[in-house]
Amino acid sequence: MRPRGQLATVLAGLAAGVGLSGCAGHGSVAAAGYRANVAQTAERISLAIASARMGVQLDLDGKMALAVTDQTVSHAAASADSAASALAGREPAGEAETTLRRQATAPIQDAVAALRALRDAVGRGDRGGIGRALSGLDGPAREVDELRRVATGR
């Protein structure tokens, strides 16, 4: 297998792992369960951001074709959106979890929006837009990492 083919296989595997790590079902969950759902959502979104960044950086370095980058980034954006939607379908069990939900909403929405912007720029083949969108992931990535720390208490 050529290096690009191997890289595409690795990225596809990473993206598939991100997609398979999702939360199933909806409804109210106990306090610890809700915190775990928030932490898992933040982790999935962090992995999606890392996957998208890696794909774009490899493309910018000339090590991956734009079409493969487009697939990688599109899958990352879809995975983050799916994780956000799954969490939105969960009802917090109590006041502390409701507060956590309020804390989680903006970082999750910002990260999903940033990944969508990157996906759109890659889809257009807009190199300047790709660079701006890639930089635009920095803040949301930090916010989601902080959310994960808050949700896990670490």
Show where each model-derived region lies.
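Bacterial signal peptide processing site
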Residues: 23-27
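Alpha-helical segments in soluble extracytoplasmic regions
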Residues: 33-116, 129-153
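C-terminal motif of bacterial Sec signal peptides marking the signal peptidase cleavage site
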Residues: 18-22
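Flanking scaffold residues of small Cys/His-coordinated metal-binding clusters
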Residues: 15
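Bacterial N-terminal signal peptides that target proteins for export
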Residues: 1-11
